[in-house]
Amino acid sequence: MNRRTLALLVAVTWVSQAANAQQGASAHEISTFTAANGSFRFSYPSGLQVCAEGKIQPCIYSYIPVCEQDALACVVYPEKEFADTNLGAASFQVREILREGNIPPTNADDCVTPNPNDQPRFLISARHPAEVIGGVSFIHGTSDGVAAGHAIKQDLYRAFHKQRCFELSVSVTWTNNFEPPLKTLSPPQQKQLDETMSTILHSFSFSD
């Protein structure tokens, strides 16, 4: 191989790597969501769908919803992201917890104490009961459920801030009732999903 050919190959390789890097950067551009009243914010990949308070319905499409109608904000993976797998949906959500009669909890203990009327159920994790997010300590709970061959797993995080009870959640649904069975996420896909949701969760912060 002469020097001219070698130089040409190096140039082609460099251009290809630069193009791939540029595509990767654009695919992972970051957007910031700020609550209408400015009380909180978080960051998320711009390719994900985000729905805000009062306009949550477009983010509710899976058999078991991963966004609640009363959410303050909800971010979901696009359906095509993991096509042809058994993943139903994945989301990060922010809610304000209210008790029966739309009465807010009046203190931190009431905010994080499991309540029979909670939907989803909030059961404090024995293995990992607390998580620091945005400099604030949240109580960590879990919830799961099944419905007609579909299942959901949720990690819930609650904190009492400025006289309001906030709940952050990361939810994943999947199905196992198809014939033939759909494939599960590959290890790289699972890692991508886990890291993305964790990054969104830990980007959350209160504005005051």
Would you name each region that the model predicts?
Residues 7-16:
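Bacterial N-terminal signal peptides
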Residues 1-7:
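Bacterial N-terminal signal peptides that target proteins for export
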Residues 18-23, 27:
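Boundary at the C-terminal end of the N-terminal hydrophobic targeting segment
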Residues 32-116, 147-152:
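Secretory pathway targeting signatures of secreted, lumenal, and periplasmic proteins
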Residues 29-31, 164:
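Short structural boundary motif marking the start of a folded domain
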Residues 25, 53-57, 128-136:
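Short, ordered beta-strand-loop transition motifs
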